[in-house]
Amino acid sequence: MRLTALPAFADNYIWTLIADDGTAVVVDPGDAAPVLALADQGLRVDTILLTHHHDDHIGGVPALQARFPGVRVIAPVEERIPTATGRVGEGERVQALGRTFHVLSVPGHTRSHIAFHTAEHLFSGDSLFSLGCGRLFEGTPSQLLASMRKLGTLPAQLLLCCAHEYTVSNAVFARHVDPANAALWQRQEEALAMRRDDRSTLPVTLANEFDCNPFLRVHAAPIRASVSAHLGRDVVDDVDVMAGLRHWKDGFRA
């Protein structure tokens, strides 16, 4: 089994798991072209997994359905994804390529956002990024906190496969919030070196994210202190920290 991140648009990744026989699971194909280029070399798409309804994640589905009639399209319970052939929610499982993809409900970025994880990988869409998380378009800080806590219980060895190359820009904000975090400094330097060489900063272990990502560490004293200082008052609880942290990030300029 081979994991490939297909670049799309300015900074998207279309994650593709490819079996030895060329059969594939494709995650969030906002653009069909990168997948169709592999199809011209023999790739056969068996299953498409969709994390949420935004067009840069689902826009390529009709063209892939035309190329691969009968392909499964698994999506959240969401009326804004009309191309879905199956809909799943929290605790359900998808079987594909001999692997089990566990479904997690992770609202925040959108109200119906889901993630998929196997024994090796977490496909988080726009819920969790390396060193960051998705902007709140439809969800609440309380929902975002619950989603981050849920992702924070996953095995540390899982590889985070998120949908955007935001690591370097996220690192600047994370360092501003948590400047004494040595692991974060190291992750930033590694990410900068990777991007200078035009390499992806992903996947990355959840263990690294647990150490470095401020949105997974709202309970930690340094994060709480930074958010309190930014707000000019003591934070009340973890929801207050998450709300302040997300709002801070939304308006942050390095």
UniProtKB/Swiss-Prot annotation:
Reactions mediated catalytically: an S-(2-hydroxyacyl)glutathione + H2O = a 2-hydroxy carboxylate + glutathione + H(+)
State its Enzyme Commission number(s).
Answer: 3.1.2.6
InterPro entries with a match to the protein in the record: Clx_II_MBL (IPR035680), Glyoxalase_II_hydrolase (IPR050110), HAGH_C (IPR032282), Hydroxyacylglutathione_Hdrlase (IPR017782), Metallo-B-lactamas (IPR001279), RibonucZ/Hydroxyglut_hydro (IPR036866)
Name the SMART domains for this protein: Lactamase_B
**Keyword vocabulary terms for this entry:** Hydrolase, Metal-binding, Zinc
The entry marks the following residues as binding Zn(2+) 2, namely D56, H57, D126, H164
GO annotation (BP), single: methylglyoxal catabolic process to D-lactate via S-lactoyl-glutathione
CDD domains xrefs: hydroxyacylglutathione_hydrolase_MBL-fold (cd07723)
Which cofactors, by name? Zn(2+)
Cofactor note as given: Binds 2 Zn(2+) ions per subunit.
Q: List the disulfide bonds.
A: none
Q: In which pathway does it act?
A: Secondary metabolite metabolism; methylglyoxal degradation; (R)-lactate from methylglyoxal: step 2/2
Q: Which residues hold Zn(2+) 1?
A: H52, H54, H109, D126
Any Pfam family from its record, for instance, is Lactamase_B
Q: What terms describe the molecular function in GO for this protein?
A: hydroxyacylglutathione hydrolase activity; metal ion binding
Q: Which family does it belong to?
A: Belongs to the metallo-beta-lactamase superfamily. Glyoxalase II family.
List the PANTHER family: HYDROXYACYLGLUTATHIONE HYDROLASE, HYDROXYACYLGLUTATHIONE HYDROLASE GLOB
Complex formation: Monomer.
Role this protein plays? Thiolesterase that catalyzes the hydrolysis of S-D-lactoyl-glutathione to form glutathione and D-lactic acid.
Name of the molecule in the record: Hydroxyacylglutathione hydrolase
Q: Which organism is it from?
A: Stenotrophomonas maltophilia (strain K279a)
